[in-house]
Amino acid sequence: MDTKLMIFDLDGTLLDTIGDLAACCDHVLAARGLPLHTYEEYCGFVGNGVMRLVERALPEELRTPETVAAVRADFVAYYTEHIDRFTRPYEGIPELLRELVQRGVRLAVASNKFQIGTEKLVRIYFPSIRFDAVFGQRPGVPLKPDPQVVREILADLKSTDHYKGTA
């Protein structure tokens, strides 16, 4: 079977983003006089989108919908401007992606990171690599592991051969 399309997650798969997520979240927490967290704690906070990251980083008594939404807005604004201070591609990833493109494989990203952040990171770290679809978190689209974002990519790219693999 010839592989025609590969869909990748972004954070923790193509890019090591935890340093910027942690630094930016701590910046927002510090601005509000709230406790900061260790790198190791942030490793346990990430993986389900920005809303869950912020919720987990806040003290339990402040995890109201209003506070989480306000801190999320501050985080997104700050993170969008400081998204690439510590983030790096994992070793060998740019070369792998270039090799796949040379073999005629179409590439896509399906991320739980907010859409603008997803697009910005792909532009910064993979400027010479063509991605046929870059989908981040968007209103009305459930977060992964819900398959909707993958189905949207498959539909947009009119891909009909489906094989679900794991790395």
What are these regions (language model features)?
Residues 30-35, 60-66, 103, 126-130, ...:
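Short helix-capping segments at alpha-helix termini
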Residues 85-88, 114-167:
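Substrate-recognition "cap/lid" segment bordering the active-site pocket of phosphatases
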